[in-house]
Amino acid sequence: AGLTKRSLFDPSCTGVFDRQLLRRLRRVCDDCFNVFREPNVSTECRSNCYNNEVFRQCMEYLLPPHLHEEHRLAVQMVGK
């Protein structure tokens, strides 16, 4: 069941399975998609478990600087 639950979130994330962290990271991608309306933003933002340039750009664009480090750490935790 763990694997199914995990894959409902983001199959590329093989680190800590933390629903809240994953939800927060996904929200950055969703908000980014809503702002830019580029079809590939959502997919690219989630690729490699959020450890990518698109996610970083979305985060810098959408989030106040004091939250950047927190999100970077979250990416490391849920990633490999």
UniProtKB/Swiss-Prot annotation:
Localization, UniProt: Secreted
Arranged from A to Z, the UniProt key words for this protein are: Amidation, Carbohydrate metabolism, Cleavage on pair of basic residues, Disulfide bond, Glucose metabolism, Hormone, Neuropeptide, Secreted
> What molecular function terms (GO) are annotated for this protein?
neuropeptide hormone activity
Q: Gene3D superfamilies, alphabetically?
A: Crustacean CHH/MIH/GIH neurohormone
Q: Quick one: a GO biological-process term for this protein?
A: circadian rhythm
Is Secreted set as a keyword in this record? yes
| Location of Valine amide modifications | 78
Kindly list the cysteine pairs connected by disulfide bridges.
Answer: 13-49, 29-45, 32-58
Q: Which PROSITE patterns does the protein's record reference?
A: CHH_MIH_GIH
Q: Which tissues express it?
A: Produced by the medulla terminalis X-organ in the eyestalks and transported to the sinus gland where they are stored and released.
Does the record's keyword annotation contain Disulfide bond?
Answer: yes
Alphabetized InterPro entries for the sequence: Crust_neurhormone_CS, Crust_neurohorm, Crust_neurohorm_sf, Hyperglycemic, Hyperglycemic1
The entry's cellular-component GO terms read: extracellular region
Function statement:
Hormone found in the sinus gland of isopods and decapods which controls the blood sugar level. Has a secretagogue action over the amylase released from the midgut gland. May act as a stress hormone and may be involved in the control of molting and reproduction.
- Family affiliation: Belongs to the arthropod CHH/MIH/GIH/VIH hormone family.
Which protein are we looking at? Crustacean hyperglycemic hormones
Organism, as annotated: Penaeus vannamei
